[in-house]
Every structure is written in C-alpha cells, then in structure tokens.
Amino acid sequence: MPKKGNYMQNEKFDKDTQLLVDVVTDYAFALDTLDDYDHQRLVLRKSTAAEKFHATYENAMAAIQGLKEKFGGSELFANEKDDSFKSSIGQIYQTVGGVELYPSVEQKAAMLLYLVTKNHSFSDGNKRIAATLFLWFLLNNGILYKDDGSKRVADATLVTMTLMIAESRPEDMEMMVKVVVNLMGRL
C-alpha cells in the first residue's frame, strides 16, 4: 500500500506534468518550428499569392521619407550609401525562366525585411527602415491585419525577426526567409 506522502507527491507530479503538457501543447507550433529549423526542414506554408501592391524604389523611398518626417532621427537616418537599396527592391521581384523566386506576398515581404536589414544601404536606421518597409508592404497588400483588425505581426515578433536576421549568417538567408514566412502564416 503506498504511503500517503508518496500519493500526495504523485498527485502533485501528475498536476505539474499535466500543466507542462498543456503548456507544450499551447506552444506546439513554436516548438515544432524550432525543431524544423534545427533539422533544416522548414517549408513555406500558408501564403498569399495575389499581390495587390507592387513596391518600387520610388514608392519605398517616399515611405521612408514619411518615416523620417514623422519620427525624426539623426542627420544620417535614411541617407543612402550606395545603390544597394534599389537592388533590394528589385530583388524581391526576381524571376528565373519567367517564374518568380518569391511568388507570395509573405515571401516578398520577408525578403524585403532580410535584404534591407542585411545590405546596410543606409548610413543609419537600416533595421527600423527594414521593419517599416516590411509592415508597409504587408499593409499595402492587405494582409498586415487579421480580419478582426488585430495585428498579424506583434511588436515583439517584428523586433525578434529583425534582430534574428541582423545577426544571421549570409548563408542562412533562405532559412531566415522561411522562418519569417512561417511566423506570418501562423500569426
């Protein structure tokens, strides 16, 4: 016959175990995404094919100018260092044999976030500009907000994705884009 103390410990263990199982279940997508990332098997899911808005160098620079006017910044904020920003905008529409390399809105947005963050096209504000253009692109394509009006990408998620890209190795570009697209598909 089990001792009363052991029964109480087992009951607590069972409650703690169930609580942990519930938490893990609630975070299953995040844990599965991390596992897929670790094993280099992330795939692109749930994306929006229909693009309503086409980003150009000119309309992107107008958006950046609006950011600068509204939020200010240093004298160097948003000053282009070279032509790499123009290249970044063009690259999200790159094709091979007439087939887009980034066919979905989410892939283009993720690539835009990646390229503007990594290319350091501006003297100051690259991460802020990249995050703003990411949101701008999603907004203009009608997918920044959920049907109920809530944010599709939480503030903390945007910061995390941008910093993750900034700290990533160039050879991890494809995986970073997949992570961003997967997070957007789930949010």
Residue ranges and their predicted role:
Residues 1-187:
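FIC/Doc superfamily catalytic core
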